[in-house]
From Swiss-Prot:
PANTHER family: ETHANOLAMINE AMMONIA-LYASE LIGHT CHAIN, ETHANOLAMINE AMMONIA-LYASE SMALL SUBUNIT. Signal peptide: none annotated. The gene is eutC. Its cofactor is adenosylcob(III)alamin. The keyword Chaperone does not apply. It is found in: Bacterial microcompartment. Pathway: Amine and polyamine degradation; ethanolamine degradation. It comes from the Bacteria. Adenosylcob(III)alamin binds at V161, E182, C211. It comes from Pseudomonas entomophila (strain L48). GO terms for cellular component: ethanolamine ammonia-lyase complex; ethanolamine degradation polyhedral organelle. This is Ethanolamine ammonia-lyase small subunit. Pfam families: EutC (PF05985). Its EC number is 4.3.1.7. The basic unit is a heterodimer which dimerizes to form tetramers. The heterotetramers trimerize; 6 large subunits form a core ring with 6 small subunits projecting outwards.
């Protein structure tokens, strides 16, 4: 007797070309096909590896130096990866030695800056390795054209989002943007998140931050992320706030679904 159970055709199969999401996986009897099971296990392994991948800060600093950008290497209060994962609060503050180094830098460079750019490994150093330099290339070119000033790029080992508040406060920056590896998903182990804050200081909650997420080749493009961040910077300085009271209403150009050309506006607000 032939015990082979064929995998039936799935009418949704064509939709898989439009999304990396796990849809139209098919079935063999009442189970998933072997290929889908193996793909899931592989994606799960990639996500776990992304969380534990060491932060190659030396390589990133060298790349920044090659582009003519100064950088500072700091460490959070979390001593290692294990403590970082177990104690999120320690990842939100700088180690005292790092905080003192920033104070000395600020004293040697008085006057403050418009923006402090902070880069932390977060939960995916892979995202930071892949996307930090390409994004900064697009963003800093446009920011310089608009006249914004910035401090040396600050790299924080074992850092979480809120550590940028302390960095910005110590540097006297009007604004901070944190580039951090987001929690890996099963289809996105390398998503970079941008967290923007106006008037940073220790103790701010997430309500005072704006998030631009999923910056990667398969997600939000570097150019669009830079466009949205610059919009937030301009509006934050004009209105002197950030977070839930500052909505992203940046105009974006998209292709009309009827192929009649381009249109502008925020599609989330039904404009254009």
């Amino acid at each position: 007797m032939d015990r082979h159970t064929p995998t039936p055709d799935n009418p949704w199969l064509a939709l898989r070309n439009l999304t990396p999401a796990r849809i139209a996986l098919g079935r063999t009897g009442i189970s998933l096909p072997t290929g889908a099971q193996l793909d899931f296990q592989y994606a799960h392994a990639q996500a776990r590896d992304a969380v534990h991948l060491p932060f190659d800060h030396a390589g990133l600093r060298q790349q920044l130096s090659d582009r003519g950008r100064d950088s500072l290497l700091l460490h959070s209060a979390a001593s290692d990866r294990h403590q970082y994962l177990q104690r999120p609060d320690l990842g939100r503050r700088l180690h005292e030695d790092s905080a003192q180094r920033l104070r000395e830098h600020a004293q040697a460079n008085p006057g403050g800056v418009d923006l402090a750019i902070v880069v932390a490994d977060g939960l995916s150093a892979l995202a930071v390795h892949r996307h930090t330099l390409p994004f900064l290339s697009r963003f800093e070119e446009q920011a310089a054209a608009e006249g914004w000033t910035s401090a040396p790029v600050v790299l924080v080992e074992q850092g979480r989002v809120a550590v940028a508040d302390e960095v910005g406060e110590l540097l006297g920056a009007r604004m901070t943007v944190m580039l951090i590896g987001e929690r890996p998903g099963l289809s996105s182990p390398d998503s970079l998140g941008l967290y923007f804050t106006y008037a940073p200081k220790v103790g701010l909650t997430d309500a005072y931050r704006n998030c631009i997420s999923n910056v990667r080749l398969e997600g939000l493009s570097y150019g669009m992320a830079a466009h949205r961040l610059l919009y937030l910077m301009r509006e934050a300085c004009r209105r002197q706030l950030s977070g839930v009271n500052l909505k992203d209403e940046a105009e974006v150009h998209s292709i009309d679904s009827n192929n009649t050309g381009t249109k502008s506006g925020n599609f989330l607000l039904g404009e254009g």
